[in-house]
């Protein structure tokens, strides 16, 4: 009976850990989706054309990894409502960092910030748009990155947008 209790305790700990891990992943996916929708809304409003932002997989790129490291180490800090172009952006990728808005699971809380992100990325010069009638752009949005607050010495949560800036990056699988 003692062995059964020990096994069940270990199983319970495993189940709880798994549920916590997947819960965070689901939350980040929701936030990323809302941010992506806000980018599409901002582009449509400002440029009067529809661009579908597709998810790219650019987190293995130097531009992203160096930017994330600087956010985590408190080197890059961004005030709420503003965006910062990463110095690690290069010929293929444009990297923009923002402080995550409160209630980031709602599109309306990303709307103003999405325009700021696009302006910081320099619209068409910093974001490769493919197609003529059905336009698409690729972005990798990573949320929930812990860093330091821009105005106070406390923790803050950041989101990093990595846009394909060139056709080469856009076609990169």
Question: Where does each model-flagged region fall?
Answer:
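Short, well-ordered surface patches within globular domains
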Residues: 26-93
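A well-ordered secondary-structure block
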Residues: 87-173
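Intrinsically disordered, low-complexity segments enriched in small/polar residues
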Residues: 12, 21, 54, 79, ...
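Gram-positive cell-envelope targeting signals
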Residues: 1-35
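Phenylalanine-focused residue identity feature
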Residues: 4, 53, 58, 161-163
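Generic low-polarity alpha-helical segments
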Residues: 16, 63-68, 129-132, 173
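Intrinsic-disorder/low-complexity peptide segments enriched for small residues
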Residues: 16-19, 83, 111, 116
């Amino acid at each position: 009976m003692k062995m059964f209790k020990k096994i069940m305790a270990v199983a319970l700990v495993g189940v709880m850990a798994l549920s916590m891990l997947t819960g965070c992943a689901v939350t980040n996916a929701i936030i990323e989706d809302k941010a992506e929708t806000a980018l599409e809304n901002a582009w449509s409003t400002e440029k009067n054309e529809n661009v579908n932002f597709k998810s790219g997989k650019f987190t293995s790129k130097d531009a992203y990894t160096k930017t994330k490291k600087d956010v985590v180490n408190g080197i890059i800090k961004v005030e709420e409502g503003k965006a910062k172009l990463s110095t690690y952006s290069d010929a293929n990728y444009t990297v923009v960092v923002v402080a995550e808005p409160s209630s980031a699971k709602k599109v309306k809380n990303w709307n103003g910030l999405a325009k700021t992100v696009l302006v910081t990325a320099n619209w068409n010069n910093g974001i490769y748009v493919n197609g003529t009638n059905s336009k698409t752009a690729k972005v990798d949005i990573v949320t929930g990155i812990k860093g330091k607050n821009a105005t106070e010495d406390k923790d803050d949560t950041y989101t990093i947008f990595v846009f394909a800036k060139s056709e080469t990056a856009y076609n990169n699988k």
